[in-house]
């Protein structure tokens, strides 16, 4: 398939004294740092990360982490690699600073499977105009590259921050969240450090996202008793019992939709998959249902399942030979950061000064690892990154704007300089 070649949008390098809408002017240090962030270096690192693949499910993030680690080490960052499972390492890379609170960046190394139908090899990155194409370009190899090169520019400019700037890159974000769970577990009870804020570099099209819903996967198992369909009363039909539970779930979904949050919408249920029975002429002895529950900030999947199980008992669905069990196989909490938080104001201002125009403040329909940082460590969290979640992430011929990559890196650098600050001479 032939693509029309978009016209690249030049991003002028900001200079000292630049102001946007009355925002604070860029300092000489800020301008010097931003001038060291180049399009060529961002395209090169993003391309290398795309080529490393890391499809998941499959657990193949190791090569991506190796490429990322090599880039961080080449720039002199302190690094730590911890295997969550064989060949599946979390990476922590830090630009050291003083003892003041630092700034945390969060990303993930895995990508969803490429699938079929690509115009070119999904793991051989290519560029057409302003678009860099390849699986993970938007979600989220570009965001990772932008973080690394933002911190590298600060170091190259001989700026010492008052506190650390740290990148945590986890595995398995696209599936069960093994990486972020291992991180939060290993960090207890001391925590992960003193950070003024966390910036998740997922694709937001340079929008400042201050909250997102969480997500939970729930597996429902119903056990009954098989019998000949000519005498169904001799058996206990697991599919029939499961259908009654599904009716409870759908009723709760309707209840949730009646209470819409202006930023995030509402929690929701989705029945994603059903398996049950062994034959048309047999009473179904078993049924399994896979369920997705989108969580509002503060909701807990285990509490939700406990309430549903109580309804099942109240309706006597799990009686007379029917056994019902629920299992939460994955939970990712939602979060919300106040619109007046310092990281929000700083991100909006930095985006304008970095050449990205106005960054609107909004919510996010997807879930991400940032909810764990907010819930487990109480760190104010936003999502801000290059790429279009709705039209590029997880899509055939996924691509990202090179212009957005450059702007995102500049914003990340400005956030370090402004939220953490320079160390005293």
Question: Which residues does each PLM region occupy?
Answer:
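Metal-dependent amide/peptide-bond hydrolase catalytic core
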Residues: 2-3, 26-28, 83, 210, ...
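Acidic-glycine-rich active-site phosphate/pyrophosphate-binding loop
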Residues: 112-128, 195, 210-222, 349, ...
